[in-house]
Swiss-Prot record:
Family: Belongs to the Casparian strip membrane proteins (CASP) family.
Name of the protein in its database record: CASP-like protein 2A1
Biased composition (Basic and acidic residues): 1-11
High-level lineage: Eukaryota, Viridiplantae, Streptophyta, Embryophyta, Tracheophyta
Glycosylated residues, chain numbering: 68
Quaternary structure (record): Homodimer and heterodimers.
Regions of this protein lying in the Extracellular compartment: 54-74, 135-155
Subcellular location(s) of the protein: Cell membrane
Sorted UniProt keywords: Cell membrane, Glycoprotein, Membrane, Transmembrane, Transmembrane helix
Length: 204
């Protein structure tokens, strides 16, 4: 009886991962779609980075540049890292699925999550700085800056908006990499100790 149960476990284990790999290998359109989805943020990241790098203004009140604000410098670095990773991951995603090993799937999952939070944080802190620049803070007697540096604020706003579009792409990529990872594992099972039968919680 125990040998029979062990055989059932062996035949049941890994079935999810095998089905996922077979589905990926027989669907070249899926690989193409993922590659294009990973390439899409490259242009957006570069656009957000370039707009912010060129963001400076000089008038009778003085000069201001993105480099004067830590949040904007972080935004530039985050978009640069994101552009490089997007290009590299797209090249790897375009490779045949025969190399789609568990370490590779885990790597994509972890890095996609990391980049999502990295870019989201960059957009969030920059948006907060822009809010203060547009509205000021009367509680601590901060006056708004955008009334004096309108062009600077408009370019910074454009860069932040583009960054949030990048976040949307990376949320989608994170969902895809999560699906590809966790569908490789079989659902948990409940063992009936009285009948020594193994019953899948999510029975196929």
């Amino acid at each position: 009886m125990e040998k029979s149960n062990d055989h059932d476990k062996a035949s049941h284990g890994g079935s999810g991962g095998g089905a996922t790999e077979k589905w990926e290998e027989t669907s070249p359109g899926i690989r193409t779609a993922e590659t294009m989805l990973r390439l899409a943020p490259v242009g957006l990241c570069v656009a957000a980075l370039v707009v912010m790098l060129k963001d400076s203004e000089t008038n009778e009140f003085g000069s201001i540049s993105y480099s004067n604000l830590t949040a904007f410098r972080y935004l530039v670095h985050a978009n640069g890292i994101c552009a490089g990773y997007s290009l590299l991951s797209a090249a790897i995603a375009a490779m045949p699925r025969s190399s789609s090993t568990m370490p590779r799937v885990w790597t994509f999952f972890c890095l996609d999550q990391l980049l999502t939070y990295l870019v989201l944080a960059a957009g969030a802190v920059s948006a907060e700085v822009l809010y203060l620049a547009y509205n000021g803070d009367s509680a601590i007697t901060w006056s708004d800056a955008c009334s004096s540096y309108g062009g600077f604020c408009h370019r910074a706003t454009a860069s932040v908006i583009i960054t949030f579009f990048v976040v949307c792409f990376y949320i989608l990529l994170s969902l895809i990499s999560s699906y590809k990872l966790f569908t490789r594992f079989d659902p948990p099972s409940i063992v009936d100790s009285d009948k020594t039968l193994e019953v899948a919680v999510f029975g196929s």
